Amino acid sequence: MPPPTAQFMGPTQAGQNESQNQSSGEAGEQNQEHGQGPTPILNQSQPASSQPQHQQQRNESISYYTNFNQPRYSTDASINSFLNISDNVPVTSTGGPSSGGAYSNLPRLSTSSTHQPPDLSQIGRGFSIVNNLFPQQQQLQNQHRQQQQQQQQQSHQQPPFKTPSFSTGLTGSSSQYQFLPRNDNTSQPPSKRNSVYLGPNDGPDFEFFSMQQSQQPQFQPSSRRESNSMRPPLLIPAATTKSQSNGTNNSGNMNTNADYESFFNTGTNNSNSNQNPYFLSSRNNSLKFNPEDFDFQFKRRNSFVRGTLDHSSQNAFIPESRLNSLSVNNKANGDPVADNVTNNMKGKSNEVDNDDGNDSSNNNNNNNNNNNNENNNDNNNDNNDNSINSATSTNIPNQEDHSLASTDTTSNSRKDLKEIEQRLRKHLNDEDNYSSAISRPLDKNDVIEGSEGLNKHIDESGMQPNIIKKRKKDDSTVYVKNEMPRTDPPMSKDNSTSAEGAAMANFSGKEPPIPDISSVSDDATNLIGATKVDQLMLIIQARKKGFTEKVNTTQDGDLLFNQTMDILPPKSELVGGVEKPKGTQNTRAVKKHECPYCHRLFSQATHLEVHVRSHIGYKPFVCDYCGKRFTQGGNLRTHERLHTGEKPYSCDICDKKFSRKGNLAAHLVTHQKLKPFVCKLENCNKTFTQLGNMKAHQNRFHKETLNALTAKLAEMNPSENIPLEERQLLEYFASIYKNSNRGIKGRGKGVGTKKSTISSPENHPASTILNPNTNANNAIANDSENNGNPEGNIDSSSNSNPGSHSMISPTQKDMGTLQSQFIQNNFNNSVNSSNPSNQPIINYNYTTLPHSRLGSSSSSNTNNNNSNFSVGAAPGVLMAPTTNNDFSFNLDQSNDNERSQQEQVRFKNINYKS
């Protein structure tokens, strides 16, 4: 291959080329103003005959070692789409230049009859004027054909995410340019060659990001230079169409939020007809997301992104917690900045419900708006403008029907929560007025009653809709979500040295308060006798305590009894829970903190503090989903897993997941093929892995048998004998269902919401209560003066000597001796006795401990004379004289007499890490 030869031009030709370069430079600058970038200059060669050139070979020149005339591989056809090369001269009718206009010097790729195909190898990166010093050689035809074939393939089959350039143009008119007039005179940088350009017809290529066809803009700039500059995302909470519709504020200055207002206000007509709300808030080449793109299944209802991208809303979404803080907290603190923000937000709608009693507050809000030069023509007496309009509210997006609760309701609820905390402190510190200091649960009256009584009902529309849907129908407590700030809870796990704990620690050795019936929530009471098994266990527990009165039943097997009868367990025992396993004295800590209600002992003051909450109904932890309250934070977290679907516990064998650790433990039994629970009703002998499954089985398939056993045991005469089989069956029920009727939510459909089926005789006038024992003991139990005594103790009017009736602890060693002495004596002739003081009252080892103010030393009650000794009992338990009729069957488990009193009191299973 011979070395290339360098060719030089004469002075005349050099001057022509210099003038041509200057003119082409001016044309390039002109094209640069129209968004085309620098236009490449082609050295169109003239015939050799018209322009004679002086050629001279210089082998020692640098051109001897330089390859200028070979094709440039850097401008390969694979990167042609990135180069600013036009395929043809634009021919448009809407302002584009014609073929003979100022843009006729653009290079062409297509062949014509008058011009030869240009050499594209010298156009690209590293373009230099040195290339024009040498004559061009003919380009190979095969390379040109290859470029044409590749361009045809690109025009017919474009990839979904293409890299278009100015050579391809818009989709549908790839061979034309569109030069549109500029709308502004601001100096902006030129467009980049490799920027992604999305035209209005590029929707099919970007189906995931494409918008609706009805919302396609009719106007689209030719490049990014025609759009406004990119600004960082900004949320404008107080933009209104009244004051900013023309893009100017009251002072006459340009409004900087006009672009963002046009982004959210799709229906407003701006002064500029070419302005499009979808493409003016940012650069035209950026990707826009439509709210329908996020309309998938498991989205959040109050999504922050969805509220921002929703074009139907009049403003950006404001988080509810932030909105509450602006409307309540900052307003109360008197912050002038917060007041201005609140007044701006209330320009079109206030956060106060439309009520006749709130006209003065609405007028004040309108006056504040007049001071801020907004809504100057508002009528102070127009309540419709002051009410919250769900269609035109500028504060809250209404696609999910969110609305704010009334400020009065929020303040009233917060006031009620403070009153509960004050009542708790007063209750724990006061020792004289026990009955007045008892706290009661938060009911509807507490939430509804305000300081002036303006609001007589709670507007359900002001509450969160998801709370209303998931709330139980029979729930007697109304809770409003996020009314109390979660930053300052009434009680927390770190508040171990609080005033409540210190006050409860001072209860040792003092008289505890008497818990009122109304002070305990009815949730635990409704669980008593919920099923047939529970009703049978209720009468078994009553007979176990020594209750011998006859109780009538209905045709359906429901129990009928008076409130004075001691069938129902005391309120202090309706705390639920499962007893912890027994331990030794060395492994368990000394329990020195005593509960003033049930006299249970705890090793730590914080344990006692949590335990007392269950007695007084104080539940500071609220579920944000359904409004249910809990006494412990751990129980709340476990409950919230039902809403969130979280299941952190998984089985190692089958990988099944559970939300509770106890459910996992019950599931592991199924893999071990163990079924410890056996149904003994009617010789069924069906085995079960869980007790709840057997209970549901018995309530469904052995309902008649349970009704027969309940009726027989309820109407049994003390003189009758119990057959051996029935006694064993009763002992079987008493052993496996020992935690029944203690306020624990059991298994089965509708157990948690079902009211107790036990009714009183007043509701059934046709039924009569047969009292075979009309002695003085029953007179004491049915005495009208004794009804006010929640403990059911002996009436003081029946005996002038209160010291003659003393109580014996159920954990004392001589309890078995007293029972044996009592049973061995013959009391057949004392049924009609008129001396109630001689009738013994025995406590059959029930769970609660005696009150210290009613008891005395048990050493004085060890007299063997039956007429001189009288023992105490559990609250309201009266023991009628019995005969030797085998009725005194033992349903209690064996107790270790060597254990101390502190060890025998066990507390429920509490998650103390909450």
UniProtKB/Swiss-Prot annotation:
One term of GO molecular function = DNA-binding transcription activator activity, RNA polymerase II-specific
Q: Where is the composition biased (Polar residues)?
A: 13-34, 107-116, 164-194, 391-412, 754-770
Query: Looking at the record, which segments are called Disordered?
Result: 1-63, 93-124, 138-275, 326-415, 743-812, 853-877
Which GO cellular component terms are attached? cytosol; nucleus
Instruction: Please cite one Gene Ontology biological process associated with this protein.
Output: regulation of fungal-type cell wall organization
Annotated region Polyglutamine domain: where?
A: 136-158
Keyword list (alphabetical) reads:
Amyloid, Cytoplasm, DNA-binding, Metal-binding, Nucleus, Phosphoprotein, Prion, Repeat, Transcription, Transcription regulation, Zinc, Zinc-finger
Identify residues that carry Phosphoserine.
61, 286, 325
Q: What induces it?
A: Expression inceases under non-fermentable growth conditions.
Does the record carry Isomerase as a key word?
no
Biased-composition ranges for Low complexity? 44-56, 138-158, 206-222, 245-275, 359-390, 771-782, 796-809, 856-868
Name its cellular compartments.
Nucleus; Cytoplasm, Cytosol
PROSITE patterns tied to this protein:
ZINC_FINGER_C2H2_1, ZINC_FINGER_C2H2_2
Mention any Pfam family matching this sequence.
zf-C2H2
User: Zinc finger regions (C2H2-type), where?
Assistant: 593-615, 621-643, 649-671, 677-702
**Which coarse location class applies to the principal site listed for this UniProt protein?**
nucleus
- According to the record, the residues making up region (Polyasparagine domain) are 362-386
What is the annotated role of this protein in its UniProt record? Transcription factor involved in the diauxic shift. In the presence of glucose, activates carbon and energy metabolism genes, and in te presence of glycerol-lactate, activates genes needed for cell wall maintenance. Binds to DNA elements with the sequence AAAAGAAA (A4GA3), a motif enriched in the promoters of AZF1-sensitive genes. Required for glucose induction of CLN3 transcription. Also required for proper FLO11 expression. May also function as a corepressor. As an intrinsically disordered protein, AZF1 is capable of forming the prion [AZF1+] that confers resistance to the drug radicicol in a gain-of-function manner but decreases the expression of AZF1's target genes.
Q: What else is known?
A: Presentwith 556 molecules/cell in log phase SD medium.
Question: What PANTHER family does the record point to?
Answer: C2H2-TYPE DOMAIN-CONTAINING PROTEIN, ZINC FINGER PROTEIN
Record comment regarding domains: The polyglutamine (polyQ) domain is required for transcription factor activity. The polyasparagine (polyN) domain plays a subtle role in transcription but is dispensable for localization and prion formation.
Name of this chain's protein: Transcription factor AZF1
Its ancestry begins with: Eukaryota, Fungi, Dikarya, Ascomycota, Saccharomycotina
Query: What gene is behind this protein?
Result: AZF1
